[in-house]
C-alpha cells in the first residue's frame, strides 16, 4: 500500500495508511480500531513489505519487555523499523511497543532491547503503587503537532515501567504520578506513548486524529524545539 503526501485539510486530505505490526503483543485490534476512527486507513499486518509502504508504522505492545522484544525479532520487524527511522518516516510506539525501541529495561536486565532510541526503561519507584493503572493527567512540556490539545487532559495508563530518554530534549510530555515520568517521547520521526490512546476515550481519539493529520501534512517527523515548561521529573537517570 502506498499513499502520496498532501497539504489539504479535512475531507480533501489524502488518506493516511497506518500499518499496525502484529507480533503477538496484545492490543493490535484495539489500536487498529482507534486509528480507523481517527481517519487513517489502518490495517494489521505481519508482512514487512506491506508495512514498509504505509505512511505511519505503529508498534503496539502489552506484556513483558523480554518476551515482546523476542517476538518482535522473531517476526522479522527489526530491520523494517531501523530502515524506517533511518529514512525519517513516522513511527508510533505504544506502551511496551515504545519501550522495546530502547536498549534495555529494568523489567528484564538480561534482554537486549532494539537500541534504536537512546535511553533506558526504568521501573516506577517503590514508594508509589505499582502497577500504575487508571486515568492520570498528561502535562505537555514541548510543542509537537501530535499532542496539540493534550496538555492537562487525562489519559489511561497501565504499566510498571517507563522509558527514560538519554536526552531530556526528547521528552514531549510527562505524568506527575509519584516523582513523575516521561509519558510522551519524541526522537526524530519516532513518537512514543506510555499511555494507551486507544483506551483514553475522547482524549486519545483527539490525539490520534492530530497525529494522523500531522502525518498527512508531512510534519510528524519534524524536530520539536519549543520548550513550554520545565520538565520537573524526578528520578533522573539513576538506576
Mark where each language-model region is.
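Extreme N-terminal starter segment of soluble prokaryotic enzymes
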Residues: 13-19
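Conserved beta-strand elements of the Class I
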Residues: 19-21, 156
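Structural signature of beta-strand start/N-cap positions in the alpha/beta core
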Residues: 41, 56, 90-92, 154
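Short acidic/histidine-rich motifs immediately flanking catalytic phosphotransfer sites
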Residues: 51-61
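Pocket-forming structural segment of enzyme catalytic cores
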Residues: 103-179
Amino acid at each position: 500500500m502506498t499513499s502520496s503526501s498532501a497539504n489539504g485539510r479535512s475531507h480533501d486530505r489524502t488518506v493516511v495508511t497506518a500499518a499496525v505490526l502484529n507480533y503477538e503483543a496484545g492490543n493490535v485490534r484495539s489500536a487498529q480500531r482507534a486509528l480507523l476512527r481517527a481517519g487513517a486507513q489502518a490495517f494489521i499486518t505481519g508482512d514487512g513489505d506491506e508495512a514498509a509502504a504505509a505512511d505511519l508504522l505503529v508498534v503496539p505492545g502489552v506484556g513483558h519487555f523480554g518476551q515482546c522484544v523476542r517476538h518482535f525479532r522473531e517476526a522479522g520487524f527489526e530491520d523494517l523499523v531501523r530502515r524506517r527511522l533511518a529514512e525519517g518516516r513516522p513511527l508510533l510506539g505504544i506502551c511496551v511497543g515504545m519501550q522495546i525501541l530502547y536498549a534495555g529495561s529494568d523489567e528484564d536486565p538480561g534482554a537486549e532491547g532494539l537500541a534504536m532510541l537512546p535511553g533506558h526503561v526504568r521501573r516506577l519507584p517503590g514508594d508509589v503503587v505499582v502497577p500504575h493503572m487508571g486515568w492520570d493527567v498528561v502535562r505537555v512540556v514541548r510543542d509537537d503537532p501530535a499532542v496539540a490539545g493534550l496538555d492537562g487532559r487525562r489519559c489511561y495508563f497501565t504499566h510498571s515501567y517507563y522509558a527514560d530518554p538519554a536526552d531530556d530534549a526528547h521528552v514531549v510530555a510527562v505524568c506527575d504520578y509519584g516523582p513523575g515520568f516521561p509519558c510522551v517521547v519524541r526522537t526524530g520521526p519516532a513518537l512514543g506513548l506510555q499511555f494507551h490512546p486507544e483506551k483514553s476515550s475522547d482524549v486519545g481519539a483527539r490525539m490520534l486524529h492530530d497525529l494522523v493529520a500531522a502525518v498527512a501534512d508531512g510534519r510528524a517527523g519534524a524536530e520539536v524545539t519549543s520548550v513550554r515548561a520545565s520538565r520537573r521529573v524526578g528520578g533522573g537517570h539513576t538506576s
